[in-house]
Amino acid sequence: MTEFLPFVARHIGPRHEDERAMLAALGLPSMETLITQAVPASIRLNRALNLPAALSEADALAELGTIMGRNVVKKSFIGAGYHGVHTPPVIQRNLFENPAWYTAYTPYQSEISQGRLELLFHFQTLVAELTGLPVACASLLDEATAVAEAIGVACRHHRDKRSRILLAGELHPQTVDVVNTRAEPLGWEIATGSDVDDNTAAIVVPWPDTRGVYGDFAKVIADAKAKGALVIAVADPLALTIMEAPARWGADMAVGSMQRYGVPMGFGGPHAAYLAVSEALTRIIPGRIVGQSVDAHGRAAYRLALQTREQHIRRDKATSNICTAQALLANMAAAFAIWHGPAGLQAIATRVAALAARFAAALKAAGVEIAGESLFDTVTAKVPGKAAAIAAEADKGGRLIRIIDADTVGVTFDETSTEEDLTALASLFGAKPVGGDTVLVPGKERGEGFLTQEVFHSHRSETEMMRFLRRLADKDLALDRAMIPLGSCTMKLNAAAEMMPVSWNTVANLHPFAPAEQVQGYAKMTSDLEAWLCEITGFAGVSLQPNAGSQGEYAGLMAIRHYHQAWGQGHRNICLIPSSAHGTNPASASMAGMSVVVVNCRPDGDIDIDDLKAKAEKHRDNLAAFMITYPSTYGVFEEGIKAFCEIVHDNGGQVYFDGANLNALVGLARPADIGADVCHMNLHKTFCIPHGGGGPGVGPIGVAKHLVPYLPGHVEAGSEHAVAAAQFGSASILVITWMYIRMMGGAGLKKATEAAILNANYIAHRLKGVYPILYTGAHDRVAHECIVDTRVLKDSAGITVEDVAKRLIDYGFHAPTMSWPVAGTLMIEPTESEPKLEIDRLCDAMIAIAGEAKKVADGVWPADDNPLANAPHTASDTLATEWKHPYTREEAVFPGGAFDPTAKYWPPVSRVDNVGGDRNLICSCPPVAAYG
């Protein structure tokens, strides 16, 4: 790769000599020959991508530094759901900036995910303690979408027989915007006021409201209870450390943002939202839930619980389309609470509340009218005709306050606010603060009886906290240890140079509603990224707002819906989806108000074009969209893709292109050229944003020219149909993708795609003599991933795909995607970043496992006592005094004899009991009093 800058060669795993050896193994003379065989000529891009030439790491960092230097970072008192924070350095360095945490995948393989599962369990415990509700999920995307998700829970609770939602107080404008977007296709009636009727599914109570005021909701809550409506509290989690828990005053659900628990504003994200519910709602809440179970030896172990609720299983009947959430940020929030403990959290909250109370008192003394009598951190002041002038004066002093309207301003205090700030802000109103520590929060004080669990009291010194985070990280297997060959997940390198800017002050510490002239760096960076993604995909416009791939799907389908409505075709509501589709596809279609019609696939995995044609023609008067993943979820470039698109267009539909497998296309083909009208791009797959152990993700959408007017809007931009709380979604991590594209250039991106395809075909070639490769395209080639049929081991030896997955842990690997899209198989995606040495190690392990299964088939090892059935093996099990197994300890933990013992990964638990964990659901740690 001498023609490329060093970064490209560092990003791509195989060296030049490795590439030649792999091609030789495939019997091919060149990479060009492989691409000609694997990628249909009809879709190939016959020109280079028109992107800026690649830069070195140093030059790209310097250029981005100059761009983001255009941002003017001033101290924000805007509030509206976003607050300044002090991220504890021990958390920033040992968690947020630690690849052991941010390169991990969603913890579906429990045995190699105990560290992050444990911290997410503590996050759920934190939320349950704050809200007084027994069940919390392990994060949602942001506060606005969390409110919408809670409303969805309420409607499902009433079996969709009630559709009216009462907003009982003033929510943040962006929350109302997102709720209205979600309501329209689902037929929710959004009302305001205090009138609860028999059709009301839920009331939404802001606690406090967007003005900072705690209203008197006693009557409307009582009315809701009398009418059977659920009560949803939108509650500030910092305020809840000194206030009565929402469950105490009648909340059935509570939602909010955990951003102020140590997570920077980041110009809007990413941040973890929380959702907690009463026990009766447990099985219909969205998102992932961490539960406690036991392993095969009775040791406590964590796992993802109640997965049958999730979109990948229930599809169009799922409770939500939430897939990727905000695990990394939820873990930061949990660590923040563990670091400070309950007393520390209460000290922060009390100080913030006292600053706000003193500010309110000073304004009142100066004759300024303020909203409400009870408040936590925000003071809303009436300043007839002077709002802009006062805000301008604050700006001159380096502080930003919120202009609510021409006559009203809001000032929100936070953890970073000082006495100097208080004095300066009061002076803008002709006021002078006095001393005191009175707070104005309503109701009973929280007291000391919360977060009594030991973990929130044991890590007061930095030494203890550092070691705590290290111990958790050591339990997990992430990309910093080994290959994660998950099909359809694209676990590629997240380069250090890409990650560094996320922590820059000019990236991390801007409020999303800061004045436009102060965020010109973000404007330039996002404009660059939109243009580059348009060039890569061929589309006319891009929205960066969706903060997960699932939200990109939803945004894209909503753009199609609004397009049809604009042309008087609002009756079009049929969405054709192949039977092989990702589970989010049908879930998103249902959320967008569409009815799903399944298109069959042929035995070779390709879409049945005759079935597609028949169903498109049958529904031609009502056809809205066709959702297709390309390359297919079976890991094959289907030759008929353009014909599929033509059939849909001929029958009045739009083509939605699921970009989950875009890593096989970049630089080789473009969705828009193929015939797609809209496509979402997983920046946390193809474009190097890390998975974070289950989020954050970013799922921007690209659209053809006719759909550009229907891209997501935002209330702050004077438009509608937002799908996320902030205009640019998880804006701060967009710099990762900016850096990746800037350092790779068009030629480097194409080379990465070619390497990904080569790696997958090399794996398929090495394994096909042992395991059938389930689907291949022309010339017996796969795309960037392949499905390995392990059912042959089940047939010959009774060895299940789960046995293989768990045995791979003993070999030092995260298992490939298990039983999807075909039950009993493994789907392997190596990405371009894995070197040949690691790929060979995986292949050697898979071949060795087949050999172990043969020993079971031949009767050498019993079917119920062999290394596969007992996998994974922990150090404590292996060191037990008695060893009664028919295989040796060495065969258990150093299989194949090809491992460096010093590099051995030891799982902390043996196989986790999934069934028992769901039957006996434990998803938070009981308080100390429960053991009395």
UniProtKB/Swiss-Prot annotation:
Q: What is its EC number?
A: 1.4.4.2
Note whether Oxidoreductase occurs among the keywords: yes
InterPro entries referenced in this protein's UniProt entry, alphabetically:
GcvP (IPR003437), GDC-P_C (IPR049316), GDC-P_N (IPR049315), GDC_P (IPR020581), PyrdxlP-dep_Trfase (IPR015424), PyrdxlP-dep_Trfase_major (IPR015421), PyrdxlP-dep_Trfase_small (IPR015422)
Q: Which GO terms describe its cellular component?
A: cytosol; glycine cleavage complex
Q: Which GO terms describe its biological process?
A: glycine decarboxylation via glycine cleavage system
Q: Which UniProt keywords apply?
A: Oxidoreductase, Pyridoxal phosphate
* Modified-residue entries (N6-(pyridoxal phosphate)lysine), positions: K685
Name the coenzymes or cofactors required: pyridoxal 5'-phosphate
Tell me the Gene3D superfamilies matching this sequence. Aspartate Aminotransferase, domain 1 (3.90.1150.10), Type I PLP-dependent aspartate aminotransferase-like (Major domain) (3.40.640.10)
GO molecular function term, any single one: glycine dehydrogenase (decarboxylating) activity
Is DNA-binding one of the keywords UniProt gives this record? no
Q: Which reaction does it catalyse?
A: N(6)-[(R)-lipoyl]-L-lysyl-[glycine-cleavage complex H protein] + glycine + H(+) = N(6)-[(R)-S(8)-aminomethyldihydrolipoyl]-L-lysyl-[glycine-cleavage complex H protein] + CO2
Protein origin, superkingdom: Bacteria
The similarity comment for this entry is: Belongs to the GcvP family.
Q: Which function does this protein serve?
A: The glycine cleavage system catalyzes the degradation of glycine. The P protein binds the alpha-amino group of glycine through its pyridoxal phosphate cofactor; CO(2) is released and the remaining methylamine moiety is then transferred to the lipoamide cofactor of the H protein.
PANTHER family per the record?
A: GLYCINE DEHYDROGENASE (DECARBOXYLATING), MITOCHONDRIAL, GLYCINE DEHYDROGENASE, DECARBOXYLATING
| Subunit details | The glycine cleavage system is composed of four proteins: P, T, L and H.
Q: What is this protein called?
A: Glycine dehydrogenase (decarboxylating)
Q: Which organism is it from?
A: Brucella suis biovar 1 (strain 1330)
